[in-house]
Amino acid sequence: MTTITPLHHIRVALERNPYEVVIGNGGLARLGQQMLDAGVQADRRVLVVSNPDVANPYGDACLNSLREAGFSVELLVIDAGEHQKTPATVAEIHDAAYSAKLERSSLMVALGGGVVGDMTGFAAATWLRGIQVVQVPTTLLAMVDASIGGKTGVNHPRGKNLIGAFHQPRLVLIDPSTLNTLPEREFRAGMAEVIKYGILGDTALFEELEACPDPSTPAGLGAERLSSILQRSAAAKARVVAADEKEGSLRAILNYGHTFGHVVETLCGYGTWLHGEAVAIGMVAVGELAVLRGSWSRDDAERQRRLIESAGLPTAWPDLSADAVLNSLQGDKKVRDGRLRFVMPTGIGSVEIRDDVSREEILSCLERLKG
């Protein structure tokens, strides 16, 4: 039986179309009311998009809550692995939107992890030139990162998330009780993004995780610490997004670990590593690059590595050719005027964005990672 807890509200204070991130156990049963509270009219048509592993335990609760609030609801269940994160799957969502007679006043609800959220958000952004979307993340990674901030998109054979749009949600609802059925590997993958926030600016969060004997499972963290992690991580993401909605400057720091991480995902093949696992490897890699450049201490790099390992995440760089890595890096979305930008750690709780990393430094870093 899910324990109902009070809802915690975090405001994403955008200049246009601000919205709330609502967190609390039993939140899924209150989704319909929360949408009404967010100003959505009760007679709207809603298409809920989910995947089998989520729709089975949580689909009925979601649909019942929406119908009780007066919404007309249809459910679409799709496969949602990284291999399915394609324009073809988005077209499947569009087909369902057509069948459900979604209008410009209608909404889509993404019930699932980051892949469901990314694809549903992109489908909403492109249906009838844009309809509203509500994000209901059910994985740790989606709760603390992917569902907040409006980044949507799908993969291209040449790289991850190369096709996409910024499309902010009307509401984000996080029900931590859905983590109870999340596979342990998926939970660990989400911890990579939590650790990332510690490096980016929350030193106390990093140290709290270091002091935890087992940060790799909900039980190891404990309910109180897990609730705190969700709230602090979501608040950190909300602050950055509010300050820089479309990644003109500050928001780029959220890509810490992602530059090398996307290389790992792309070259190893989508699905070999979960996104959070690849980010963990990428964090270790860029940490090594920062040590090589003299901007980060070896002690801090080892603290990061130990915490990532204690969360049950991989740290070893895969066997990839240097040429393939360099080619993949040049296709990264963060390239500006032909210069690749890295989010580089300078301490536990501080980073900087650098665009002066040379080809030789990257090659030296890759050699170090092999050892």
From Swiss-Prot:
Keywords annotated in UniProt: Amino-acid biosynthesis, Aromatic amino acid biosynthesis, Cobalt, Cytoplasm, Lyase, Metal-binding, NAD, Nucleotide-binding, Zinc
Subcellular location: Cytoplasm
EC identifiers of the protein: 4.2.3.4
Superkingdom in the source lineage: Bacteria
Binding residues for Zn(2+): 193, 258, 275
CDD domains: DHQS
Residues annotated for NAD(+) binding in this entry: 114-118, 138-139, 151, 160, 178-181
Pfam family, one: DHQ_synthase
MF (Gene Ontology): 3-dehydroquinate synthase activity; metal ion binding; nucleotide binding
Record text on cofactor binding: Binds 1 divalent metal cation per subunit. Can use either Co(2+) or Zn(2+).
Cofactor needs: Co(2+); Zn(2+); NAD(+)
Parts forming coiled coils: none
Catalytic activity field: 7-phospho-2-dehydro-3-deoxy-D-arabino-heptonate = 3-dehydroquinate + phosphate
A GO CC term assigned to this protein in UniProt: cytoplasm
DNA repair in keyword set: no
Keyword DNA damage: no
Pathway the protein takes part in: Metabolic intermediate biosynthesis; chorismate biosynthesis; chorismate from D-erythrose 4-phosphate and phosphoenolpyruvate: step 2/7
GO terms for biological process, alphabetical: amino acid biosynthetic process; aromatic amino acid family biosynthetic process; chorismate biosynthetic process
Database matches in PANTHER family: 3-DEHYDROQUINATE SYNTHASE (PTHR43622), 3-DEHYDROQUINATE SYNTHASE, CHLOROPLASTIC (PTHR43622:SF7)
Stated role: Catalyzes the conversion of 3-deoxy-D-arabino-heptulosonate 7-phosphate (DAHP) to dehydroquinate (DHQ).
Family (UniProt): Belongs to the sugar phosphate cyclases superfamily. Dehydroquinate synthase family.
Protein name (database record): 3-dehydroquinate synthase
Organism: Synechococcus sp. (strain CC9605)
UniProt gene name: aroB
